[in-house]
C-alpha cells in the first residue's frame, strides 16, 4: 500500500524511524496507506490537506484523484478551491442539513440555492 500512495521510494530506507519523522505530506499519505489493505468501501477524509503547504496539498490531491476509481472517497472540507479541484460531486451542508447536492462544476458555476452561492462567494463562513 505504500507503493499505491506513492510513498515507498521516499520511506523504504527509513522504515525503522518514527512516523513523526516524516513530512506532513508523507504522514497524510501514510495514513491513507494504512487503510488500503482492508479494502474499505469508503475513504472518509476530514480536511486531508489542512496542515499542508501548497506542494503537499497538490501531492495529496493527486493521490485522491488516483484512488477515486478504486474507492468511494468522501472529503470534508471548508476549502472551496480544494472542493472544486478534488471532486466530481459536491454536497453543501449548513447546520447539519444538505442544502445542495450536484456535480461540482454545476455547484460552482450555477448554484441552485442562494445559501450555497453566498458561501462559495465568501459572503459568510
What are these regions (language model features)?
Residues 18-22, 26:
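Conserved ABC ATPase signature
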Residues 39:
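Conserved catalytic motifs of ABC-family nucleotide-binding domains
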Residues 43-46:
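Catalytic Walker B motif of ABC-type/P-loop ATPase nucleotide-binding domains
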Residues 101-102:
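ABC ATPase "signature
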Amino acid at each position: 500500500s505504500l507503493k499505491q500512495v506513492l510513498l515507498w521510494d521516499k520511506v523504504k530506507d527509513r522504515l525503522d524511524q518514527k512516523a513523526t519523522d516524516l513530512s506532513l505530506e508523507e504522514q497524510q499519505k501514510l495514513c491513507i496507506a494504512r487503510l488500503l489493505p482492508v479494502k474499505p468501501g469508503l475513504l472518509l477524509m476530514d480536511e486531508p490537506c489542512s496542515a499542508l503547504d501548497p506542494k503537499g496539498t497538490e501531492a495529496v490531491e493527486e493521490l485522491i484523484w488516483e484512488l477515486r476509481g478504486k474507492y468511494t472517497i468522501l472529503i470534508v472540507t471548508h476549502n472551496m478551491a480544494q472542493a472544486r479541484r478534488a471532486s466530481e460531486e459536491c454536497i453543501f451542508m449548513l447546520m447539519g442539513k444538505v442544502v445542495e447536492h450536484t456535480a461540482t462544476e454545476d455547484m460552482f458555476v450555477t448554484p441552485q440555492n442562494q445559501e450555497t452561492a453566498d458561501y462559495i462567494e465568501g459572503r459568510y463562513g
